[in-house]
Amino acid sequence: MGRSLKKGPFVDEHLMKKVEAQANDEKKKVIKTWSRRSTIFPSFIGYTIAVYDGRKHVPVYIQEDMVGHKLGEFAPTRTYKGHAADDKKTRRK
């Protein structure tokens, strides 16, 4: 179930302040955040936001087609190493 339209999209205030502060600077630095729940706004386009995945910050370059999605969608939290190999030689009969 999505968020109500009357509420509007959610973004953490501290993240919005960091993006607005960098809008004045010429050089765009990587913005670190723990806020995976924040919605990507059109003003974020062109910035690199490092989203925390539980172990490290994953750099995510914001593009136009990402607007409206959540930051956490682009920083997976689980690493899939694949299923165990089916080694028939070592199996007992």
Curated annotation (Swiss-Prot):
Keywords: Ribonucleoprotein, Ribosomal protein, RNA-binding, rRNA-binding. One of its GO terms (biological process) is translation. SUPFAM superfamilies: Ribosomal protein S19 (SSF54570). Disulfide bonds: none annotated. Gene3D superfamilies: 30s Ribosomal Protein S19, Chain A. GO terms for molecular function: rRNA binding; structural constituent of ribosome. The keyword Membrane does not apply. Pfam families: Ribosomal_S19 (PF00203). Belongs to the universal ribosomal protein uS19 family. This is Small ribosomal subunit protein uS19. The gene is rpsS.
